[in-house]
Design a protein with these regions (language model features):
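Alpha-helix initiation and N-capping motif
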Residues: 10-11, 20-24, 125, 151, ...
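Generic low-complexity, intrinsically disordered sequence content enriched
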Residues: 17, 49, 176, 190-191
Length: 192
């Protein structure tokens, strides 16, 4: 998906992370969560790719979306998790993960790289950071901001859809087909 991003500053920003072999190795080995969804080795990569694919699809339906901004935000939305969670087999919250969380940590990481790119447009930087800050959608879900631009809303919807469907997939994988599994507090529903 990096090659789809044509805006030169966003493209360079993506390469500053995903062109770094050590970062990519770490990113590919991390989970997306301790236990909620994609809580396995490679879960962060799988979740990120799924969210990015959903966002790319949204762009075909809603042409007013800035595709370069949304795809970049999708690829970066959980980037802070490489520092929020420790490596396997521990896969537990780090001190910074407990104190700051992946959203704040991700925005800090992105901001640090943006400062190294000459002429990075300030409005574009703010819009990208906003997408990351708002990707959980609601304050009660840990989002410091609610989505204020269409790209942030689309990212929130894609992230939520993939996380919830993965929860369902994981629950259904261990169930007898056609049988009720029982109440899932994250879905707030009985699942079949």
């Amino acid at each position: 998906f990096i090659q789809k991003v044509k805006e030169p500053h966003l493209h360079e920003l993506l390469l500053s992370f995903f062109g770094d072999k050590e970062f990519v190795k770490n990113f590919c080995q991390h989970s997306a969560a301790k236990s909620v969804h994609h809580g396995f080795i490679g879960g962060l990569l799988e979740h990120t790719l799924s969210v990015t694919k959903i966002c790319d699809f949204f762009c075909t339906l809603y042409p007013m979306i800035n595709r370069d901004l949304l795809l970049t935000a999708a690829m970066f939305h959980d980037i802070g998790k490489v520092n929020e969670l420790s490596d396997f087999p521990e896969n537990d919250y780090t001190d910074d993960g407990q104190l700051l969380g992946h959203i704040v940590m991700g925005v800090e990481m992105i901001g640090s790289h943006i400062r190294e790119i000459p002429g990075f447009p300030p409005v574009l930087a703010s819009e990208l950071k906003h997408c990351i800050l708002a990707h959980h959608g609601e304050f009660e879900y840990g989002s410091p901001k609610k989505p204020a631009i269409i790209e942030a809303a689309a990212l929130n919807f894609a992230d939520n859809a993939d996380a919830k469907l993965e929860i369902m997939k994981e629950q259904l994988a261990s169930a007898t087909p056609g049988e009720w599994i029982g109440f899932n507090r994250l879905m707030d529903s009985n699942i079949k």
